Structures are given as structure tokens and as C-alpha cells.
Amino acid sequence: MRIYLRVVLPLSLALNSYGVLAFFWGERGVCAMRLLEREKKELVHHIQTLAERGRDLAAVVDALSFDEETIGAYARQLGYVRAGDVLVRPVNFTVAHMHTLDSGDARPLVAPACFSDTRCKVYALCVGFFVVLLQLLWGSARAYFKT
């Protein structure tokens, strides 16, 4: 019975510690899932921002394609003049809002910070070896004080 406990106790504690580590801090654990959910929310927000920028750029493209006033203002800013026009540079007049629109930025993906499965197994083995070591020390101390 004593040998049975010396084997079962470290083994069960090692397996339980592996289960707890993998469940909470493993690659598919609770911590990793929370990080992935937060990343998903950020990506959805980023996609919505890019969709808004896309609508703004589509409006600018439509204005530059079909609106004569916008085409004329943009052409004048580039230095073109219609035949018969006098070249006058208006003060405080820019079409700078067309130049401030960009197509968006790339968002780097970050890997979730969690333990790999191998690391969880190594920690569980360390727990098992630590329990075996404690059993050996406790048994030798008990034998020492018994005499």
C-alpha cells in the first residue's frame, strides 16, 4: 500500500497540475481565449474604421469622376487653367481634405501569450518530481525521528 501511494500521489498531482495549467494558461486555455476575444473585438473595430475610410474614398472618387466643380478645383490646385481663365491664386483656399484621406494601415497580429503544451507537460513533470522528492525527504525524516 505504501509503494502504491508513493506512485499514485505524484502521478495524480502531476496529471492534475497539467490539466490545470493547460485549462487556464495553455494554448487553448481560458487566458488565450480571452486574448483572442479581445483581438477579435479590436479587429472588428479596425474593419469598421477601414469601411468608413473606404466610403470616404469612394465619395472622393465619385466627386473627382463626375462633379465638375471638384474636378476644376483639383485641376486648379495642380496648376491647370481653362482657356480664357485668368490665373488667380485664392487666399486660404485648399483642397487639402482630398490629400488627407488614406487607404488605411495594416494592423499587426500578436500571438497570445500562453504556455505551450510542452511547457505545461514539463511543469507537470516538475510537480511530480517535487512530490517524489518531498515524499523521500518526509520518509527519511520520519525514519530519522523514529529511532
Swiss-Prot record:
Pfam families: DivIC. InterPro entries: FtsL/DivIC (IPR007060). Keywords: Cell membrane, Membrane, Transmembrane, Transmembrane helix. It is found in: Cell membrane. It is a multi-pass membrane protein. The chain crosses the membrane at residues 4-26, 123-145. Disulfide bonds: none annotated. GO terms for cellular component: plasma membrane. Its main location: membrane. This is Uncharacterized protein TP_0181.
